[in-house]
């Protein structure tokens, strides 16, 4: 039994280098096997989860189809159907790395694809463009033979060129889409959110949903371009265009330079304005005659309620938002076609505007977060700035209302004229509504080179309350209107006689108010109010 000392020392000896290397190698092999096994297990679990999700999505789609008797028209609609059941596919990526989800519009079902694009669950249509890949890659959009749907939060290119279907989803940062034909003729669906859509595919039939500021139809197959969305203007160079039921289109334009034999237009919606040469066949819609300026018509359709900005066809204004867009619009003719309220002052500087009140009213009611600046509803000024106001209506009820709010050191007038501005009024009603305000107000500076000019040929003018017992219906800012003139040739003024006006103080720094040459004033009394009417002799 006893163990010798030498044997004990031998037993305590550690691993040799070779033995240690072998042990490490064994551990590495075991670790690799474990990791591979774990990853394999994880992938299987993810694939299983993705397949279960796709199955659930398809159950929802099929149930909806059974209940409604219709398939979704777009990928957006399909996604909205499942979203209503609490599943937001729009922001969903498969759990499995490099897998993707597609919507087969022919079968109306979602499909799970692996990293090679092979079907894992569901089916793909044999017609490639009827399959919609859900993606956030502009490279995929522009290079795949499938149609594509852009996931929310897309941060790719703003300008896209495609040869198959595209649905931009809820993204608004795609500002231009150009669709051109591929080798094979097809029927495609395009869905946009604003911006410009250009279609140039003489072998294809194109259906558009969503919205667009402008659609350029350069060429489509004889069967047609179908519009189901909300579009400001469709410019047609060739093809058959159909505005379908439920669509909103402000204007269709056929340039005078195109071959009219290549264009036909049909509109189920009857109030679409069509600008086209006489030879173009229009079925439905409202023929407005030839297009004098395509870009003006597009601008009118995009920013206003139609029109070309000409005297014969003014830009139509039906909302306060449209009225405010006059600020950034060009010189031209504008017409009110509704009573409107604007939430901010309208600046019409350095342009020539003719505004037809057309029997309607425009009133200033400041928005919640809007800070008053000059205080007037309409402002004109700047080099060559000219505002002409008329009322072409039989009723002559067109009215410009100033704000009802009273502010210290602000004159909340109906119209204000600034440096170098010119105002001409031929009709309408003008009302200053705040306490002690003016109706027409001029404010420039002490330099005569900045003088403003106001010429009144007709209309009715009043302020609702006096200032220190006086009504300042027409008014110059004291000491800051050198060389400015307000000349009255016609009109009726409540409690204010422009024929005997004395500007206070009378000095070279304050403008003048006077009657036109040969004009006279008569007056009538109604209770405590006196109305002064100016006429030419």
Q: Can you annotate each of these PLM segments?
A:
Residues 163-166, 183-184, 203, 320-321, ...:
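N-terminal extracellular ligand-recognition/capping segment immediately after the signal peptide
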Residues 1-15:
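N-terminal leader/signal peptides at the extreme start of proteins
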Residues 169-172, 328-329, 341-354, 364-391, ...:
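Extracellular beta-strand-rich solenoid/capping regions of secreted or surface-exposed proteins
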Residues 37-58:
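Aliphatic-rich helix starts adjacent to a transmembrane/signal segment
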